Amino acid sequence: MPKPITTIAALLAAALFTLLAWWWPNRPQAGDVAMVTQRFNSVSFAPFRPGQSPLRDIFPTAQQVEEDIALVARRTRAIRTYASIEGDYEVAEIAARHGLRVWKGAWLGQDRVRNQQELARLIATANAHPEAVERVIVGNEVLLRRDLPVNELIAAIDQVKAAVRQPVTYADVWEFWVQFPEVADHVDVITIHILPYWEDEPLGVERTMAHVRDVYRRMQALFPGKPIAIGEIGWPSRGRWREDAAPSRVNQAVFIREFIQLSQEMGFDYNLIEAFDQVWKYKNEGTVGAAWGLWTADRQEKFPLSGPVVENPDWPWYAGLALLLALALFGATRAAFPGAGWREALLAGALGNALAYAACGGIPYAFDEHLTLAVAVNLAGQGLLAALLMRRAAMILAGAGAAPPRDGRAATATVRDLLLFRWRALRDWRGFAFDDLSFVFLWVAAVLQVMLLVDPRYRDFPYPTFAVPLVAVAARTLLRDLPRGGGGREELLAGGVLALAAIASAVLEHPRNLQAMGWSLCALVLAVPPLLRMLRRQPVPAPAT
């Protein structure tokens, strides 16, 4: 029987570790980076809320747009819009009531009929609201997307320019102004996008201001005497790294504050991207596409304009959840195995944190019903795996022994039976569920890793999805419970694909991308157990039928 004082000490150590593990990455930072003004020049304004999307023609109500404009009016002089045809509201009219100026845009794509409708509405709005519309933007990144040839774009610009009194411009990434300088002769303002995160050679936040300065001066030299506006500039608050360009709330605050200071030094005419996180953008751009807002999707400011910034303001709740889950896991284990002591307490602490981390990295990013279902299934699977691991560890530490390991063939057979609604496959499930569920996570990891290899640009590294499986590998290693031998083609295929894809991803990603390097290491850790079973073949009983 373990000494109570040892168990209590282990629980206290686990609690202390939990608090430190959640506080350290969320400690106040960037307090020394000052914001030199409390009001921006302009911000991109898309008033879509969760569940709304221009891709599905689900628009906000006029009342919601009014509320959003009233909110941003406290922080900005102007707003930029991207389409002239939206819902049953006119942004320029509402903006005028709140004293805001508008950079009014028309969306141009491959549909020529729709393009003419956009241009007609743009012209009508600009002429109807000259007190609000201070410039018009004919198309956004049309050349980048290759939606129209440059001659058609120029024709659209000329069409609008002949019909409105405001300055006319076109907006695109700065490289495309270099590639198509002839467009400059048809606009009143050169509107460039500078997004260091999305550059072909991404830049860490500490290197971005020098880049912004250099690009701006290059555009001045290329188009002497022409006014230049920065139509989009910003930094994402979450998502996958690109080399050392790391999305985070702290980095976003640092970028915005330093850019505002630079803009005052150099006299930039600029527009920040963007007012609100746009959940619908994840469909095309992943998590990072939905995370450029200065406000969250539920209209909360992400960071103060001055003073320290906390990466995740909700961290105390997740730390508390980790402690509760750890106590629940240990309590349930102690009830079933009265001899459970300090080692089970430490394992429960690790699993509680893993589950809380999985929730933190999953629930806030469940942007639609499909992601919500995926997150729910994953969290349920990780919760079950954590409970089964506690049971297995307690049995091993008690000297009672655990069920003999199952191989991938048996696990695959169980999954196949369940997909065919053969519920008898779950008879005596406690004896094999841990191995079978672990193998399901292995297959999922292999599939996701292949997707990361062939289509990585918008995919997150799935640390939260495999938090408990990673703890399970570490725990089984310490318990000397990793099986050797008995593996078959399933282990070779799943483990081999995962390992090879992880190595290939690490090679393709830049070494500065520590997030990618860390995930590749985690993927290799997950791949080790099945590959170990290939070292020495042992006969394994066929799965029950």
Predicted regions, residues:
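Substrate-binding cleft of secreted/luminal carbohydrate-active enzymes
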Residues: 243-306
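Active-site clefts of carbohydrate-active enzymes
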Residues: 194-202, 221-252
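Alpha-helical transmembrane segments of integral membrane proteins
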Residues: 340-545
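N-terminal carbohydrate-binding/catalytic regions of secreted carbohydrate-active enzymes
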Residues: 44-106, 110-117
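Aromatic- and acid-rich polysaccharide-binding/catalytic face
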Residues: 98, 104, 134, 172-210, ...
